[in-house]
Amino acid sequence: MLTFSFLTLFPELLAPFAAEAIVGKARERGLVDVNLVNMRDFAQNRHLKVDDTPYGGGAGMVIRVDVAERALHSLPPADEVILFTPAGERFTQQVAEELAGRQHLAFLCGRYEGFDARVEGLVTRELSIGDFVMMGGEAAAACVLEAVARLVPGVLGDPESHQADSFSSGLLDYPEYTRPAEWQGQPVPEVLKGGNHAAVAAWRRAQALERTWRRRPDLLPDAGLTPQDTATLLELGVSQEELDVWGAPPAPVKRHRKRRPETTESAS
């Protein structure tokens, strides 16, 4: 079982994410657990104050490192102690897959002006969900919980559900359709209704390649492109120069079957 421990000043912000939908069901089945730790419980003062003014002056308040340390020491040993910070490593699908293999993850969710810099000595990893600033780490924590928990074996009903997701294959996901078969003049592609699984798989791969090329071409160098992918991208209008930059393999060589020469029987 994978346990998520979130150290926060506002556990009520994370409680719904831990109790509802797929994560909530996974907790009921004993596949994951979520531990919400209120850092105010470790303040050791009458007013439960966890922050103080910054040395050197400046606006805002800074969360004390001794409070964070006591909160961490109240937990069982963690495989990773993670701090959410704009300076951290970018959180990606690859990182999510790595974290899903752990047993216990502890997360420090900051507020105000963040933590005393000495908290860096308590953490094993720093993560960022993007180049923007929020009011606290709880929203980032919810993102990581959702992304990692769904990768734990058994959490999703279909064990292959996440393997075709955007980024898991190195590409953006292909478009999905359901009923009605036609809506406001927009029909479901015929290939999806024909029952030919090989044709459906080829169509989906081509759609994923096109979406990625048009929207996130930066993903293609690391997407593990195949020779058939190269052929598909060339048909879409991608130049050979771009493909070379991405390290794409050569497209398959189309072999034309040679016609056997006609033979004439000699007259007897």
Swiss-Prot record:
Disulfide-bonded cysteine pairs: these are: none
The biological process GO terms on file are: tRNA N1-guanine methylation
SUPFAM superfamilies, sorted: alpha/beta knot
Record bears the keyword 4Fe-4S = no
One Pfam family cited in the UniProt record for this chain: tRNA_m1G_MT
Keywords attached to this Swiss-Prot or TrEMBL record, sorted alphabetically, are: Cytoplasm, Methyltransferase, S-adenosyl-L-methionine, Transferase, tRNA processing
The record's EC number reads 2.1.1.228
- Drop me one GO molecular function for this one: tRNA (guanine(37)-N1)-methyltransferase activity
Enzyme class of the recorded protein, top EC level: transferase
Q: Which reaction does it catalyse?
A: guanosine(37) in tRNA + S-adenosyl-L-methionine = N(1)-methylguanosine(37) in tRNA + S-adenosyl-L-homocysteine + H(+)
Q: Where is this region: Disordered?
A: 246-268
GO CC annotations on file? cytosol
Localization recorded for this chain is: Cytoplasm
Task: Tell me the residue numbers annotated for binding S-adenosyl-L-methionine.
Answer: G110, I129, G130, D131, F132, V133, M134
Q: Give the residues annotated as coiled coil.
A: none
Note whether NAD occurs among the keywords.
Answer: no
Task: Tell me how this protein assembles.
Answer: Homodimer.
Describe the function of this protein: Specifically methylates guanosine-37 in various tRNAs.
Q: Which family does it belong to?
A: Belongs to the RNA methyltransferase TrmD family.
In Swiss-Prot or TrEMBL terms, this protein is called tRNA (guanine-N(1)-)-methyltransferase
**Annotated organism of origin:** Deinococcus deserti (strain DSM 17065 / CIP 109153 / LMG 22923 / VCD115)
| Gene name per UniProt | trmD
